[in-house]
UniProtKB/Swiss-Prot annotation:
Gene designation: acpS
Protein name (database record): Holo-[acyl-carrier-protein] synthase
Pfam families documented for this protein: ACPS
Protein's organism: Burkholderia lata (strain ATCC 17760 / DSM 23089 / LMG 22485 / NCIMB 9086 / R18194 / 383)
UniProt cross-references to SUPFAM superfamilies, sorted A to Z: 4'-phosphopantetheinyl transferase
GO terms assigned for molecular function: holo-[acyl-carrier-protein] synthase activity; magnesium ion binding
Binding locations of Mg(2+): 9, 63
Localization per record: Cytoplasm
Known catalytic reactions: apo-[ACP] + CoA = holo-[ACP] + adenosine 3',5'-bisphosphate + H(+)
EC number(s) stated in the UniProt entry for this protein: 2.7.8.7
GO BP terms, alphabetized: fatty acid biosynthetic process
Requisite cofactors: Mg(2+)
């Protein structure tokens, strides 16, 4: 495997909370995929703060992923096309759907993600890998 790209993002939890409040909850529905949305509602029902922290980590993960694959938030990378879920062990992993999944498969791209939150910040880091041969390093003459 070769590294296709890396991406990182940091989100301010209080800003995510403010947007969520201002939109009456629609922000979560716009950003989260169906499985993420179920987890968000369950966590928020137990603790408002943990629900918002979850939303912030998922927002951050999507931003980091979009950077790692080099598209930013442009087709086929859409908010709901990528979900960050957790294995029973707690380890996060990404799941792509629709045209994004097709785009990634055509390029042999897989990704690893890590997320963390502490008080007012959520941070994510993504390493996108490909099974394609690595590109040669560009050299300049001296």
């Amino acid at each position: 495997m070769a590294i296709y790209g890396i991406g990182t993002d940091i989100a301010q939890v209080s800003r995510i909370a403010a947007v969520l409040e201002r939109t009456g909850g629609r922000f979560a529905e716009k950003v989260l995929g169906p499985d993420e949305l179920r987890v968000f509602h369950a966590r928020r029902a137990r603790s408002e703060a943990r629900g918002i922290a979850f939303l912030a980590t998922r927002f951050s993960a999507k931003e980091a992923f979009s950077k790692a694959i080099g598209l930013g938030m442009h087709w086929p990378m859409t908010w709901r096309a990528l979900q960050t879920l957790n294995h029973p062990s707690g380890e996060p992993y990404v799941v792509a759907s629709g045209e994004l999944a097709d785009w990634l498969a055509a390029r042999g791209i897989t990704a690893r993600v890590t997320v963390s939150d502490e008080r007012d910040y959520a941070v994510s880091f993504v390493v996108a890998e490909t099974d394609a041969a690595p590109a040669p390093v560009s050299r300049t003459s001296s």
